[in-house]
């Protein structure tokens, strides 16, 4: 991952420095920009969705139930070392359910494990960590709660065609900075919506500012064009004035404060369902 490689360099900074600045930082998602191959996959899915709608189809989408496994990877057994409480984890699941329930998606906590490993806790040796900890199948969500992710608050992997037990299969899931969970101490980002955002990527969603003001943007028709990520909650922001609509600052796939986040669109719901059904729903391993 190109973006993630840069973030790992920052993660190697001394722990004392991380503690000094760790409670105040801007939102930054470490998920790689979608590859050409993945964009082509998204184009094909979008075309199928559009053709279905044009033909007068009305989708009776079944509810999606996702099993979730939490892996807390800390540098010590203290909260400041990333050792989050079970209450924080339960509250995080509640936040996810509140955000996704209107779109027919439910999350069930299936297990939580704790590991103290100073290297893994700062996102070192990602593949080795995931080979040791990953649980479930490709349709199950693994969330790795880490002490430090460099400049990022989280990152995740898009759904794709994978072979069981391949490296891509193991990499799947989301890594989340520990103090973004509900009750964490990261100013403006401690209500749990970093996980909401990253899980959106796990379902195949791009950032709302993908592609800027031109082209197909995020390939979802009902998200207004957006030139760049938002910061804070800039009401009335219109970074693409020649395009219809104000910037979707309340959309979970922007970079707004947790208090500003409110919604996914109907088109994003359809996209999440399409990706899940095509690449995850029937996974047996």
Swiss-Prot record:
Signal sequence region: 1-18
Annotated binding of Zn(2+), by residue: 197, 201
EC number: 3.4.24.-
Record's keyword terms, sorted: Disulfide bond, Glycoprotein, Hydrolase, Metal-binding, Metalloprotease, Protease, Secreted, Signal, Zinc
Source domain of life: Eukaryota
Matches recorded under InterPro entries: MetalloPept_cat_dom_sf, Peptidase_M43
GO molecular function: metal ion binding; metallopeptidase activity
Subcellular location: Secreted
Biological processes annotated in GO: proteolysis
PROSITE patterns cross-referenced by the UniProt entry: ZINC_PROTEASE (PS00142)
Disulfide bonds: 233-260
GO-annotated cellular components: extracellular region
Sugar-modified residues: 282
Gene3D superfamilies in UniProt: Collagenase (Catalytic Domain)
Catalytic residues, chain numbering: 198
Family affiliation: Belongs to the peptidase M43B family.
Function of the molecule: Secreted metalloproteinase that allows assimilation of proteinaceous substrates.
Designated name of the protein: Extracellular metalloprotease SMAC_06893
Organism of provenance: Sordaria macrospora (strain ATCC MYA-333 / DSM 997 / K(L3346) / K-hell)
Species lineage: Eukaryota, Fungi, Dikarya, Ascomycota, Pezizomycotina
């Amino acid at each position: 991952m190109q973006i993630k490689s840069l973030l790992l360099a920052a993660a190697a900074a001394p722990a004392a420095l991380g503690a000094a600045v760790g409670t105040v930082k801007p939102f930054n998602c470490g998920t790689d920009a979608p590859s050409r191959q993945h964009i082509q996959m998204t184009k094909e899915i979008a075309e199928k969705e559009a053709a279905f709608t044009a033909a007068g189809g009305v989708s009776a989408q079944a509810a999606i139930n996702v099993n979730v496994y939490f892996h807390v990877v800390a540098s010590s057994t203290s909260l400041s070392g990333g050792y989050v409480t079970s209450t924080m984890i339960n509250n995080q699941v509640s936040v996810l359910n509140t955000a996704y329930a209107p779109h027919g998606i439910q999350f069930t906590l299936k297990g939580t494990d704790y590991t103290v490993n100073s290297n893994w806790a700062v996102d070192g040796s990602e593949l080795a960590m995931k080979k040791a900890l990953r649980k479930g199948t490709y349709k199950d969500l693994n969330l790795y709660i880490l002490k430090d992710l460099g400049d990022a608050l989280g990152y995740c992997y898009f759904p794709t065609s994978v072979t069981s037990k391949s490296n891509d299969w193991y990499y799947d899931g989301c890594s989340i900075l520990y103090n973004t969970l509900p009750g964490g101490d990261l100013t403006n980002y401690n209500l749990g919506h970093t996980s909401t955002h990253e899980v959106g990527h796990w379902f195949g969603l791009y950032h709302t500012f993908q592609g800027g003001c031109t082209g197909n943007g995020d390939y979802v028709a009902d998200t207004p064009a957006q030139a760049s990520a938002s910061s804070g909650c800039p009401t009335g922001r219109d970074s693409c004035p020649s395009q219809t609509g104000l910037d979707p600052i309340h959309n979970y796939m922007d970079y707004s404060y947790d208090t500003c986040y409110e919604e996914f669109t109907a088109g994003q719901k359809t996209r999440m369902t399409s990706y899940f059904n095509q690449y995850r729903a029937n996974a047996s391993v």
